Amino acid sequence: MANTPSAKKRAKQAEKRRSHNASLRSMVRTYIKNVVKAIDAKDAEKAQAAYVLAVPVIDRMADKGIIHKNKAARHKGRLNGHIKALSLAAAA
């Protein structure tokens, strides 16, 4: 437990940041989940639209350090790969 006033303040700030970061991480997961749902439903247009909405959010969270930049790139790459496979399957 923090004893000095500055340590108490830092503990309060850390808790506030932790809570805010958890909210942002949850938002990223929701955007990713929306893309995955559209992919599972085999709806290429809806998946592409959800992906276009998700990419800036994923990038912004990576820039802020909420998620690692490599994790952001991995999510974007995999989602885009699934969407491309879906649209190729629909075209064939």
Curated annotation (Swiss-Prot):
Locate the compositionally biased regions of type Basic residues: 7-20
> One Pfam family from the UniProt entry?
Ribosomal_S20p
UniProt KW keywords: Ribonucleoprotein, Ribosomal protein, RNA-binding, rRNA-binding
**Recorded GO CC terms:** cytosol; small ribosomal subunit
Question: Could you name the domain of life of the organism this protein comes from?
Answer: Bacteria
Report residue spans for region: Disordered: 1-23
Which GO terms fall under biological process for this protein? translation
Which Gene Ontology molecular-function terms are recorded? small ribosomal subunit rRNA binding; structural constituent of ribosome
The coiled-coil regions, if any, are none
The UniProt similarity line reads: Belongs to the bacterial ribosomal protein bS20 family.
State the NCBIfam families in the record.
Answer: S20 (TIGR00029)
* Function in brief: Binds directly to 16S ribosomal RNA.
Full protein name: Small ribosomal subunit protein bS20
| Annotated source species | Pseudomonas syringae pv. tomato (strain ATCC BAA-871 / DC3000)
